[in-house]
A protein has these predicted regions:
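Anionic group-transfer/hydrolysis microenvironments
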Residues: 98
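N-terminal cationic-hydrophobic initiation segments that often serve targeting/anchoring roles
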Residues: 82-86, 120, 191
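PRPP/pyrophosphate-binding module of the type I phosphoribosyltransferase fold
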Residues: 141-215
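A structural signal for short coil/turn segments at secondary-structure junctions
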Residues: 88-89, 123, 194
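Active-site-facing substrate-recognition patch
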Residues: 4-90, 101-109, 131-166
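Substrate-recognition/cap helix-loop segment adjacent to the acidic, metal-dependent catalytic center
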Residues: 107-125
Length: 215
C-alpha cells in the first residue's frame, strides 16, 4: 500500500499551542493528527485539503464521475495511518467515529470503519463500531449552530454486543478534528461504559484557520 499524500510519518500531539483551535478539548485529552486542513479553502489549496474533501464525499455522489476519488482517498488515508502506526497493529481497540447518519439510512457512510480495516488487511486489528448514532442528524457543516458535546452525546449509544472483551486502550479515529466536540462526546460515552479505559484520539488532519482570514 502506498500513499502520494505528503503526510508526516508520525502523528503530532495536540498541545497548549494548538488546543485553542479545538476549544472543546480539555487539557487531559490526548489527541494526535497527521496533516492540517485549512478551513475555507478548496481541493486545490493543499494535498491534505484534497484528501479530506474527497474522503468526505457524500454517498449521494455515488455513481458520479468523481466517486472514484473517494475510494482513492480512503486507500491513501489507510496508507498514511499504516506508515505512522507501523506494519503491525498496536494492542488498541480502534473505534471509528460514527457518521451523522444512523445505520439503515441510505446516506450512512462507514468510511472510517472501511479505512481502519484497510490499514492492516488480513491482520488481527481490533476494529469495533462501539459507538452507534441512534438517529440521523444533519452533518455539522449543514447546521446553523455547531452542536455541543452534550447534544452530540445524546444521540450516541454503546453497541453492547461488541463490548467484550472489555477494551483497555481505545483509539477513537476520525478524519478531521474541528472543535473537538465529537471527540468529547465519544470519549464521554465510552468512559461511562468502560470506566477504566484509556482513550486517545487519532485524526487524519486537524482544521486550522485560514491565515489570510486572521489578517
Amino acid at each position: 500500500m502506498t500513499s502520494d499524500v505528503a503526510f508526516p510519518d508520525r502523528f503530532t500531539e495536540i498541545d497548549e499551542l494548538t488546543r485553542p483551535d479545538h476549544y472543546w478539548l480539555t487539557d487531559d485529552d490526548r489527541c494526535y493528527f497527521l496533516g492540517e486542513y485549512t478551513a475555507g479553502r478548496g481541493y486545490s489549496y493543499s494535498q491534505t485539503n484534497q484528501l479530506i474533501l474527497n474522503f468526505k464525499k457524500s454517498l449521494d455522489r455515488q455513481g458520479k464521475p468523481e466517486w472514484q476519488y473517494k475510494q482513492s482517498a480512503l486507500l491513501q488515508a489507510a496508507a498514511s495511518f499504516r506508515r505512522a502506526l507501523g506494519k503491525d497493529p498496536p494492542a488498541h481497540v480502534f473505534v471509528p467515529m460514527p457518521p451523522s447518519k444512523a445505520r439503515g439510512d441510505p446516506l450512512h457512510d462507514d468510511r472510517m470503519t472501511r479505512m481502519l480495516r484497510a490499514i492492516w488487511p488480513g491482520e488481527s486489528a481490533d476494529v469495533r463500531e462501539l459507538i452507534v448514532q441512534s438517529e440521523s442528524t444533519d452533518a455539522v457543516h449543514e447546521q446553523p449552530v455547531r452542536p455541543t458535546p452534550e447534544q452530540i452525546q445524546a444521540a450516541y449509544r454503546i453497541d453492547t454486543s461488541l463490548a467484550t472483551p472489555e477494551p483497555r486502550i481505545v483509539s477513537i479515529v476520525d478524519d478531521l478534528l474541528t472543535t473537538g466536540a465529537h471527540f468529547r462526546a465519544a470519549s464521554s460515552v465510552l468512559a461511562a461504559h468502560f470506566p477504566a479505559v484509556q482513550i486517545i484520539g487519532l485524526f487524519l488532519a486537524r482544521r486550522v484557520p485560514d491565515a489570510e482570514s486572521l489578517l
